[in-house]
């Protein structure tokens, strides 16, 4: 069982926000891409996105295009989007369905969906050429609770070891079985770290999110993960209908076999470095973050529901989606304003309050990951 402490107990006095360079420097951004995004396990979506053999998505990670595809054998694999002949990019559409092969549009080198080279015109005329020597370059891939993760590192930390702190933690929410009801994409003119720091505290909620603050008091927060790459805990839902929706009522059946206390809580966790996970009694929301520059972040947000909810009378996914779309946009707006202010020569790191202890803990995890001392 997890042990929760009040959010203020996770606070370490004296810590300040990060210096300006961490939000505006292209050099720091480059370090982040190489030391963090090219070395860590990153969420790239849901297994259900790749429902049939040949289904694929492209993801750009640390400047690299990666194909994530379901093979004819049903297994999901990831490969660099690079032909082994002369380096041509193989796929350009962000998602789609391939036939039984991937063919390079330049000289027609052809690969099976497991990356094996099976066609290379005229290469039989090259002495010693062996197609077995030229498979697509693989990218490490792992599945967890219905989510897919990739890692560009040559020798990545084993996924089970990296995610050990989360093993079984969310099993009661039946994450692997949940079904997507909506996905929304956002382009935010702010540094990716501001998004994480904002997610990690609700001190701003009464001012920025009056609708949210009416349904869950910002002082109700307790945390069970408050140091390291995974951080978070819960807040109490006080809405009479027991849900964070526009109506305040549940928009569908419970996502799992939840204890009584879970039916009145929303759990918020950040999974370093690119995932935010929000677990409600009647739905689960997750964000993935994709930094594009020191001041630009692409964010996807997806809402998951119990599979039996679809088609049921009274199922109202838009009640949740609209609530959080409004809340998301409030967050993105204030993060963009923070980005503008931090870019000023007048900016100096300010002190964190006891209500921002998880944001400060996230900063510590970030500094460790990039190899900088705090």
For each of these PLM feature ranges, what is it?
Residues 1-4, 15-16, 179, 372-373:
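Non-catalytic, topology-defining segments of multipass membrane proteins
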Residues 1-8, 322:
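General detector of N-terminal leader/presequence modules that precede the first folded domain
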Residues 6-20, 176:
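Short, contiguous pre-domain boundary segments
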Residues 18, 22-61:
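Non-catalytic accessory segments flanking enzyme active sites
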Residues 32, 64-66, 373:
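Soluble FAD-dependent oxygen oxidases
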Residues 39-51, 120-124, 269-273:
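Short Pro/Gly-enriched beta-strand edge/turn motifs at strand-loop
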Residues 49-154, 158-168:
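Rieske [2Fe-2S] iron-sulfur-binding domain
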Residues 75, 81, 142, 147-374:
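C-terminal catalytic domain of Rieske-type non-heme iron oxygenases
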């Amino acid at each position: 069982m997890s042990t929760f402490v009040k959010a203020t107990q996770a606070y370490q006095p004296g810590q300040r926000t990060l210096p300006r360079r961490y939000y505006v420097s292209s050099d720091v951004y480059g370090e982040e891409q190489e030391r963090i995004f090219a070395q860590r396990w990153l969420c790239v979506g849901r297994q259900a996105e790749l429902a049939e053999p040949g289904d694929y998505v492209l993801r750009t990670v640390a400047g690299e295009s990666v194909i994530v595809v379901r093979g004819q054998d049903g297994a999901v694999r990831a490969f660099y989007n690079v032909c082994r002949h002369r380096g041509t990019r193989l796929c350009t559409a962000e998602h789609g369905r391939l036939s039984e092969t991937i063919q390079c549009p330049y000289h027609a080198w052809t690969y099976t969906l497991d990356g094996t080279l099976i066609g290379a015109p005229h290469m039989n005329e090259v002495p010693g050429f062996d197609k077995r020597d030229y498979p697509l370059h693989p990218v490490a891939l792992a599945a967890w609770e219905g989510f897919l993760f990739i890692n560009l590192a040559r020798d990545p930390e084993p996924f089970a070891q990296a995610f050990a702190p989360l093993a079984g933690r969310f099993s009661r929410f039946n994450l692997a079985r949940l079904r997507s009801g909506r996905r929304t994409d956002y382009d935010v003119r702010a540094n990716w770290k501001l998004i994480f720091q904002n997610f990690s505290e609700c001190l701003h909620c009464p001012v920025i999110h009056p609708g949210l603050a009416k349904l869950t008091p910002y002082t109700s927060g307790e945390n069970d993960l408050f140091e390291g790459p995974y951080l978070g805990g819960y807040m109490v839902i006080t809405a009479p209908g027991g849900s964070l929706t526009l109506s305040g009522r549940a928009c569908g059946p419970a996502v799992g076999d939840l204890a009584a206390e879970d039916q009145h809580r929303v759990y918020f966790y950040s999974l370093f470095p690119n995932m935010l996970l929000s677990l409600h009694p009647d739905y689960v929301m997750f964000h993935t973050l994709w930094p594009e520059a020191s001041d630009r972040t692409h964010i996807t947000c997806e809402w998951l529901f119990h599979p039996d909810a679809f088609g049921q009378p009274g199922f109202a996914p838009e009640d949740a989606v609209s609530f959080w779309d409004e809340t998301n946009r409030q967050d993105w707006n204030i993060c963009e304003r923070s980005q503008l202010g931090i870019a000023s020569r007048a900016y100096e790191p300010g002190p964190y309050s006891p209500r921002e202890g998880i944001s400060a803990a996230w900063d510590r995890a970030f500094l460790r990951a990039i190899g900088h001392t705090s």
